[in-house]
Structure formats: structure tokens, C-alpha cells
């Protein structure tokens, strides 16, 4: 079994996975698994009202997570995904409070890193819809740009 398939299986089993994106390493969980997502908040010491970004495999998944996709958002996704851009859109019923921090919106991103994309595609093959993630740095530590 390759590493990304093993990581996708771990996500489906409710475990946390570290994975690279083009900007940072992420700490991710199955975005539909409340207890797994809660472990991200616990591990990071992150307040529950701070939303997570849902990483998706392709633009086609936007409508799973967003109830409305304005034309400008679709155009931005076409132009800049995969890439380091997060779209903030009105959330659908799939985007639960435990991911969105009780916000009416959801942040969506298709990362431009071969490992992240392979992981997301393997996860989709297993029935996953998205990976809720944050940067792997601790909340109180400086970011790479601050160092």
C-alpha cells in the first residue's frame, strides 16, 4: 500500500494526518468526522469558533460544500486552482458547525502539491468528501513568514 493510500485510510478511520501543501504542512481530518475534527482543535489548542479550511480534490466538489457558487467564485477557482487560494463561500448542509466554527460560510481550497492532490483523490475514492485542515504549526508559535 502506498503512503497516500495509507494516509487516506487513516483519515477514513478517524485519525489525523499531516500532509504538505504548496505553502505549509497541514494537519488534517475527515471533514465529516466530528470527533476527528475535534482532535485538530484539541491538538492545536485552537478555539472552536476559528473555522478550518476544507481541502478538496477538484473544483467539481465546490457544490458539495457551498450552497451558492457565484460566477466570480467559479472563475477564480478555474483560474487559480489548484493553488494557494481559499474561497470563502456560503456553506451547504455538508459543512457542519464543527468545521466552520459556527460561521455561515466555509473556506474551500484545492492545494497545488502532488502529495496533497494524491491524498485528496485517494480519499475521494474511499468516499471522503474533503479534508478539514490547519497549518501544522502550533497556534502560539510564529509562522514560517514571521521567523
Map each language-model feature to its residues.
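Active-site-adjacent structural elements in enzyme catalytic cores
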Residues: 1-139, 145
Amino acid at each position: 500500500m502506498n503512503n497516500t493510500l495509507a494516509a487516506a485510510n487513516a483519515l477514513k478511520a478517524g485519525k489525523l494526518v499531516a500532509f504538505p501543501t504548496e505553502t505549509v504542512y497541514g494537519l488534517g481530518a475527515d471533514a465529516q468526522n466530528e470527533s476527528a475534527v475535534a482532535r485538530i482543535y484539541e491538538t492545536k489548542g485552537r478555539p472552536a469558533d476559528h473555522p478550518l479550511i476544507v481541502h478538496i480534490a477538484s473544483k467539481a466538489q465546490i457544490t458539495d460544500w457551498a450552497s451558492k457558487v457565484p460566477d466570480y467564485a467559479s472563475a477564480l477557482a478555474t483560474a487559480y486552482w489548484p493553488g494557494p487560494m481559499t474561497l470563502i463561500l456560503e456553506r451547504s448542509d455538508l459543512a457542519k458547525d464543527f468545521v466552520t466554527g459556527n460561521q455561515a460560510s466555509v473556506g474551500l481550497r484545492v492545494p497545488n502539491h502532488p502529495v496533497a492532490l494524491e491524498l485528496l483523490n485517494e480519499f475521494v475514492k474511499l468516499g471522503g468528501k474533503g479534508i478539514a485542515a490547519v497549518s501544522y504549526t502550533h497556534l502560539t508559535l510564529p509562522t514560517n513568514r514571521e521567523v
